[in-house]
């Protein structure tokens, strides 16, 4: 339940986003399947995941539909299997269990409505690639299933349709910048940052501009 980002040998196993789809998480949960044959390496392979809260563990009190009061709320959890079919016809199944290793990471807070807090100082280089030493990490804890039903997701996935660059930028001093993308859309921002360790960068999204400023009193989503 909740959202995940999964990689195999450091590369994402899918181009889609916000998986799996929404359900009443205490009644049924969706799972996704992927063909990762092209990402397998000879020798060691590393399957890794980052878990996010999604709508399963929505905590923001301003959440539409009061998801913060949902009866299914709980900490994110996952289950996965990898089926390997060899040329000789033999099949091997690798599944998640308490032998998997876990650690804190740079995503120290994440929320559908209020966004993410990412601390680059906590980023761990190479953590999802072969050769990484996870001996100091802790073992995963087996958790109860959120619901009795696990169902294959048939709905279309959320995919990136296009990349949009700002049509205008206005600065207010040397610390505040407003970028106008010229269209109301669902998406995420990408940026490259150079700065001293400990520097904080905040992004506020808005649906309207008034007097070149983000008008945050109107319905907006971060």
Can you say where each PLM-predicted feature lies in the sequence?
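Extracellular/oxidizing-compartment recognition motifs
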Residues: 1-213, 217, 221
């Amino acid at each position: 339940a909740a959202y995940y980002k999964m990689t195999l040998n450091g590369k994402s196993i899918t181009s889609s986003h916000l998986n799996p789809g929404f359900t009443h998480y205490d009644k049924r949960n969706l799972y996704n399947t992927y063909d990762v044959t092209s990402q397998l390496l000879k020798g060691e392979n590393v399957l890794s995941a980052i878990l996010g809260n999604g709508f399963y563990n929505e905590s923001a009190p301003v959440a539409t539909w009061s998801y913060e009061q949902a009866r299914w709320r709980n900490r994110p959890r996952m289950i996965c299997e990898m089926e390997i079919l060899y040329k000789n016809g033999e099949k091997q199944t690798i599944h998640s269990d308490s032998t998997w290793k876990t650690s804190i990471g740079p995503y120290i807070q994440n929320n559908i409505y209020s966004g993410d807090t990412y601390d680059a100082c906590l980023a761990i280089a190479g953590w999802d690639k072969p050769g990484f030493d996870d001996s100091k990490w802790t073992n995963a804890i087996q958790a109860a299933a959120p619901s009795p039903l696990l169902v294959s997701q048939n709905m279309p996935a959320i995919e990136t349709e296009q990349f949009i660059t700002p049509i205008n930028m206005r600065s207010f001093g040397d610390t505040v910048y407003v970028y106008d993308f010229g269209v109301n859309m669902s998406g995420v921002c990408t940026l490259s940052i150079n700065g001293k360790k400990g520097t904080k960068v905040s992004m506020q999204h808005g649906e309207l501009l008034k007097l070149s400023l983000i008008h945050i009193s109107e319905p907006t989503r971060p």
